[in-house]
C-alpha cells in the first residue's frame, strides 16, 4: 500500500508543490517579457527579415560574452511561453509568433506600451503591499503605496501619465479592430461621445469608418487640452461625474470597471441624461468584461479574474451579468443587450 502524509498520496503532494512553485516564480513570466520589450528583441527579429540566430542576436544586443548563455535561457523560456519560436538548424535561431508580433514597435497593433506601463515598478511594485492595503478602511492599494489616488497620481506625474495614456491607446487599437465589424453599434447615430476617450484613438477610427458621425472625445481637461480635432471630431474637457455632453450615444470603454457600484451609478445616470436630452432616447454602449465562468474557457476566465483583482486595487471591479443588470436597473435603464467583442471583452448596449 502506498505511503501517505496527512491522508495525501506523495504524488498529490508533489503535484501541489509544482503548482505552488509555478506561482511563486510566476513573476519571472512578466519580468522576462519586460526584458524582451526593453531590449527591443521583437523589432530586432522583425528587422532581420528571417529567424535570427543566437550569435546574431547577442551581437546586435552587444551583451558581454559571459551573458550569452543567459540570453539563450531567457529566449528559451519566452519561447516556451509562446512569445518566440525556436528554429534549430545549423544554429539555434528565433522567429516571431503572433504574440511577439504584438510587441513590434511601429506596427499598427503594438502592445509594448502596455507591457512597459503595467510592469513599471510604479504599478507592479504596489502589489507588495496587499497585506497593508487589505486592513486600510478606505484607501485603494495605490493610495497606500503612492500616497494618493491613482488618477491624482497621474495628474502629478506627467511622465507616467504619458506612459499610461500610451498603454491605453495601444490597447484601444486592438479593440478598434473588433469595432470595425460592429456597424450595428453606430447605425442611425448622428453623434457619439467617447467618455474617458483619452487621446482619441478609438474616436479617430470611428470617424474614419463613419465620416458622417460627429464624435466627441470627453476626458479630464489635462488630457485633452492640447489636442486638435477635425471636421467630425472634437475634444471636450470636463468631469463625467458632473455632466456629459449630449449625444445620440455614449461610449464607455474600459471605464466602469475602474469604479465602485456607487460611482458607476453616478456615471450611468449622467450618461442617461446625455442621451435623453431634448426628448431623444439614445443608448449607452459599454466595452468591458462580463465574467461568466460557466461559458468561458479557463484561460479567458483567468484573465477576467486577474483583472478583477487589479481593478479591486482601484476600488473598482469586473462584473458578471447579474451585477451589470443590477446597475443598469438602478440607474434607470429599461433593457440591455450583451454581445461578444474580443476574446475577453463584451459589447454591452443599454437603453433608457
UniProtKB/Swiss-Prot annotation:
Alphabetic keyword roster: Methyltransferase, S-adenosyl-L-methionine, Transferase
Single annotated GO MF: protein dimerization activity
Active site: 257 (proton acceptor)
Record PROSITE patterns: SAM_OMT_II
Catalysed transformations (reactions): a 7-hydroxyisoflavone + S-adenosyl-L-methionine = a 7-methoxyisoflavone + S-adenosyl-L-homocysteine + H(+)
Similarity field: Belongs to the class I-like SAM-binding methyltransferase superfamily. Cation-independent O-methyltransferase family. COMT subfamily.
Protein name, UniProt field: Isoflavone-7-O-methyltransferase 8
